[in-house]
Curated annotation (Swiss-Prot):
Source species of the chain: Agelena orientalis (Funnel-web spider)
Tissue: Expressed by the venom gland.
Localisation per UniProt entry: Secreted
Propeptide: 21-34
Function of the molecule: Insect active toxin causing rapid but reversible paralysis in crickets. No activity shown in mammals. Does not show effect on mammalian voltage-gated calcium channels.
SUPFAM superfamilies found in the cross-reference section: omega toxin-like (SSF57059)
Residues with the Leucine amide modification: L69
Designated name of the protein: U2-agatoxin-Ao1n
Example GO molecular function: toxin activity
Recorded family membership: Belongs to the neurotoxin 01 (U2-agtx) family.
Entry's free-text remark on domains: The presence of a 'disulfide through disulfide knot' structurally defines this protein as a knottin.
Signal peptide extent: 1-20
């Protein structure tokens, strides 16, 4: 019985610690990890994902053409 209670307490503590870490903090990548950005021509880098370095959103105009929009 003590083992079950101890296991439940340990599980609760682990869950609490995991829940305390913000999701976004673990998901955000630096510009280098995203593959860099191309702010000079306001095009989205294919490796940078859906976001642009300047905080603008990436709109896909076609498969090969995406632009950063406000």
């Amino acid at each position: 019985m003590r083992a079950i209670i101890s296991l439940l307490l340990i599980s609760a503590m682990v869950f609490y610690i995991i829940a305390a870490v913000p999701e976004e903090e673990g998901l955000q990548l630096s510009e280098d990890e995203r593959g860099g950005c191309l702010p000079h021509n306001r095009f989205c880098n294919a490796l940078s994902g859906p976001r642009c370095c300047s905080g603008l959103r990436c709109k896909e105009l076609s498969i090969r053409d995406s632009r950063c929009l406000g």
